[in-house]
Amino acid sequence: MLTIYRRDTVNKLRQQLQTEEKIPERRTMNEKQRTYYCIDMKTFYASVECAERHLNPFETNLVVADLTRGSNALCLAITPRMKAQGIKNRCRLSDIPKSVKYEVAPPRMALYIEYAANIYSLYLDYFDPQDIHVYSIDESFIDVTDYLPLFHKDKYELAKFLMNEIADRYHIPSTAGIGTNLYLAKIALDITAKHARDHIGFLDEELYKQTLWDHRPITDFWMVAAGTARRLERFGVYDMRGITRMPTDTMYRTFGKNAELLIDHAWGREPCLISDIKNYKSKSHSVSFSQILPRDYSCKEARTVIHEMTLNGAAELMKRKVITNKVGIFVGYTHDERAPTKGMAKLDVTTNLASFLVEAAMRLYDRTTDPVTPIRRLGIAFEDVCDEGCEGYNLFTDWDAVERERSLQHTMLDINQRFGKNAILSGINYMPEGTQRERNGFIGGHRAGYDDKNGKS
């Protein structure tokens, strides 16, 4: 039976253990082998919807998808029961066989975030936040090295206990990967745990070499994308063993600085610790937005959306109290009929005021976008953002106009923060092709579902 320690006692117990065993609080990997968990919630969105309906996801055919996007809508998640029938998790509604009967749940991103926060809170009942890295909404890494002796359990028993806790409290099934470094924990989750009856996989460096060096396809491995696999194929390499046999200079010539990552991972090595992740600070900063349009848009219609996205970006910059002098645009076309177009414009001012940013974005869009080919994807980025204290304008700037616009933009931001993003809008948002009014109710590009507690849209 596992003794349950709440978060307010964990630190005291760890200090006691360190005193008794003379263990320093932090060690490098060379001093002591560490044990990491990578815990993933199975088909998270679908499992949450089943939990809300008091259904068993292993016995229920349920899909999370936005029916307002038509029969070709992307399935954000399907239940394990549907996956067991050979249906792919990220399929489209039209891909599901007609013979399969299923329930469709509209996305409720706010609800999923609430569940994720509750699960993180559960972790905090047993672990220090410095030992937890949240990788995504449904996946987290935990360094349990110092907790195994604390709880008097081995790595399997503690993992099973956590999985049972999540299931008992929130009715969400989970899977766990255990590894001697972060990479091996992730691979144990993604590959090994799938074949384990208890949904727990374990890998150390030797076991990794014995069981996965010849595993194919190589794209099953974390951080190996299809493009990387294609470049490896040119050298006759199709698995991790093949990477270990490639000349180092060839690897660096082909993959640049990413070669070091590929080589380390091929050997099952990963020197990065959770503390390194938490201490990392990016040298450059940007704010970006992207969206997939609900249908094919003409160049003129998409221009309206870029205008909206720029206004939204200006508000976000002001909210974060940062400014920029670089605007970038990305345009993707229907069915990849032609290569995407993109460009970057440098302003002669450093600002977060919409008038300057919209003017630059519209000029850039008109200069770089194909006026004929239908458009389906749009993106905008504000690069090299910095603190508002660095704001700068040129000699010809109308300072009275700048102050009026800044005051108006602040007022609109305050109103929208208090009463909702649609409380006050610009005229462009009421154009029929505009998307911002609807997207203001989205989280991560999907419906938030704030008023959807019963799963009704």
Where are the language model's segments positioned?
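Catalytic palm subdomain of template-directed nucleic-acid polymerases
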Residues: 142-163, 192, 236
